[in-house]
Amino acid sequence: MTLDEYNAFCASLPHTSHVVQWGGAHVWKVGGVAGKVFAIAGWSDEPIPYVTFKCSPASFEMLKSEPGLRPAPYLASRGMLWLQRFNEKSMSNADLQDYLRESHRLASLNLPKALQVKLGLNGLT
């Protein structure tokens, strides 16, 4: 997945916003600019970016040792359940999109309930 493909996919999810920060990383949030981060891409010298996403406890345990995946630097070391795909051979782009969709859903659950209802995200549980 190229950076353009990553950005296009994240933009297709409901109520998302994009910012470039943290050393040129493409950061996607759900719930607007003050919302919750659900995906980060960048930090790679290769044409394919490293993609970091939030996941469930079961997915984290299942995937954290798979080739091409690792607990996300900084985030996972602080107890957060985030993984980073740093090699395209580890997970198909279709699977990555599924995990990005799930990350979006998980992040939306951390928005204030009133905002979830206002944005129509309360049905994502």
Predicted features and spans:
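Charge-dense, helix-prone N-terminal extensions
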Residues: M1-T125
